[in-house]
Amino acid sequence: MFNFFAAAPKGFEYSLASELKEFGATDVKESVAGVYFSASLELAYRITLWTRLASRIVLVIYKGACDSAEQLYNAAYCIDWPSHFSHKKTFSIDFHGTGGFINNTQFGALKIKDAVVDRFRDDGTPRPDVERVNPDFKIDAHYRNGQLTISMNFSGASLHQRGYRSTTGEAPLKENLAANMLVRSGWQANPITVLDPFCGSGTVLIEAALMAADIAPGLKREKFGFENWQSHNKAMWQVIFDEAQARATLGKTRCKLKFYGSDIEPHLISIAKRNAENAGVAELIEFSVSDALDVTPPVSEGFLISNPPYGERLGNVTELLQLYYQLGDKFKKEFGGWKIAMLCSDVELISSLKLKADKQMKMFNGALECAFNIYTLHANSTRRDVPELPEGVDIIDIAPAFANRIKKNVKQFEKWAKKERIDSYRLYDADLPEYNVAIDRYVDYVVIQEYSAPATIPEAVTKRRISDVLLALPGALGIHPDRITLKTRERQKGANQYQKIDERKVEVITEEYGAKFKLNLTGYLDTGLFLDHRVTRKLVGDKAKGKNVLNLFAYTGSASVHAAIGGAKSVTTIDMSNTYINWAKENFALNGLSGAKYDFIQADCLQWIKDNSHQKYELIFIDPPTFSNSKRMEDSWDVQRDHAEMLGGLIKLLSPNGELIFSNNKRKFKMDIEALNQAGIDVTNIDHLCLPLDYKRNPHIHNVWLLTHAKK
């Protein structure tokens, strides 16, 4: 008897242990990401050829305590390596684990390599060569909690590589994961017709066909690790291999099951057909190009097993939520009598099926933790009538109170927006407390900003409500899900502060009181235009005629554009971000504005104020951040703490009869009027003049003040 370890993805341990016991292995013991077992050489060959779940099988040669580099070397040296592989064969060492005296895996591998070549040399045999890429003989070593295990890679390359895959789609499903889905779903114990409406390159269906036809998954492999092992019994292996080939021939003849696969991508169906041909099961599987929502049950009872798309694979979250909801609806209506098994990494997506699971399990697709849910469908439900909507949009009867509020707001704001000559506005701002989001309409697109939920509300409840918003919104607005983007508004730290939200790039041009602006709806948290400052920007434009205008903390220069269109004599636009300065230049070009009178400066605005007190402007607009500790700034900035000092310096740049508009978005901001008056500055609050209709639900969104030199 030999001792082995069968490695597998995390979460496979129970299934793999059961499989090994069925093969006849003894001393079966589950471990993390694998199972220990004992077997004869003949059984080990069979397991290696027939296992559908293991990734790798290693023959354990040494196992014991190890506390020093010397012990590591001695343990490896004591192994009779010349009895395991010839000096004419190349070898490599995979070392896993660190701790104690082992700081890195390279050190451990080097020590074992030295011991191996020294053992060959001391036995009077030429030393074998090391080959890292494709060695003849692989040694596996693991070090954990002071225990060292040295093994021979018995199986060779990962066993999930069956040998039939020609190429893959965007998000390939490993063969042993597909097999485990079939095992854990209960299908393997009671095989019936299988349907996969998101079949991709066909892996689930091919694995099911291999099981049903009694075809060993290792038959197509070209190489196994034991082939260069000195104790390899070629005759025994050949008998086992020939037996498996005979079983495959007979199994395909006897297999009466049919398998059905479809995918919306024609090139994936071509790959799936090629893979099935390579696996020898093409005649058992019927592939077709089809949208999953158009697939119908090929038989009255069957098993739908699939790995549909989720966020890590492809797609916009709103589209995916819609897809999952529509799938669940379709399953209930058309798949009565079927079982459904779905693998998905996103709990909210799989919850959007709105089906009650018989079983809920966890599986790992690589490092990605996934939910694997099993459903039994009974009587069909009746189809509901829906009103006429744009293609791709579905009315979803979820969150009716929210949907009704959206419809009400659309009626209120559409006429107003047209009258105001704007096509971007806030449609909804946490009007209903349980749906704690802001929804902005940008031309024909919608951006949802999720506010941070109170700590008292469970995360699962928050996620469900967001899912309901995303599901209900397309129908309520009559727009396609791909025109909806979700962003999370919460406290950001470090590198996450400006993390890109969406891999898609959606840019639109919006119009506002005759001005045009470029928006990026999916790049960074902010789109390039603060809608709450719309009226303030118009005020700047109305006051700008014939004046020298200064715009500080200018962002993308939208207030500068209004000033230029309003007839400013000159406009100076300053921001610390070069990205925003370039964006401002684009906005000017978009409006046909060019010339020497428009100046763009990338600078620390606070330092620039100090360095340019000699300059004079008739109109100044400044909208600083609430807080900043940018590395480009010498000191941190807090608008409450520092505004009086900053405005006291800025007033020096204001001409005698000039006006300074100061705005910020700090809630509970308190203007230091006394300090400013002492500095010779008159201060007037103009919030009521600068609050747009679409922000009247949230009157504290910003603070706007008009400052002038005190009258003498």
Swiss-Prot record:
One GO term describing the cellular component: cytoplasm
Domain spans labelled THUMP: 43-154
Keywords of the record: Cytoplasm, Methyltransferase, RNA-binding, rRNA processing, S-adenosyl-L-methionine, Transferase
EC number: 2.1.1.173, 2.1.1.264
UniProt cross-references to Pfam families, sorted A to Z: Methyltrans_SAM, RlmL_1st, THUMP, UPF0020
PROSITE patterns xrefs: THUMP, UPF0020
Keyword Transcription: no
Disulfide bonds: none
Keyword Transport: no
Main subcellular location: cytoplasm
Highest taxon of source: Bacteria
Coiled coil location: none
Compartments, record wording: Cytoplasm
Reaction(s) catalysed by this chain's protein: guanosine(2445) in 23S rRNA + S-adenosyl-L-methionine = N(2)-methylguanosine(2445) in 23S rRNA + S-adenosyl-L-homocysteine + H(+); guanosine(2069) in 23S rRNA + S-adenosyl-L-methionine = N(2)-methylguanosine(2069) in 23S rRNA + S-adenosyl-L-homocysteine + H(+)
GO molecular function: 23S rRNA (guanine(2445)-N(2))-methyltransferase activity; RNA binding; rRNA (guanine-N7-)-methyltransferase activity
Function: Specifically methylates the guanine in position 2445 (m2G2445) and the guanine in position 2069 (m7G2069) of 23S rRNA.
Family from the record: Belongs to the methyltransferase superfamily. RlmKL family.
Protein name per UniProt: Ribosomal RNA large subunit methyltransferase K/L
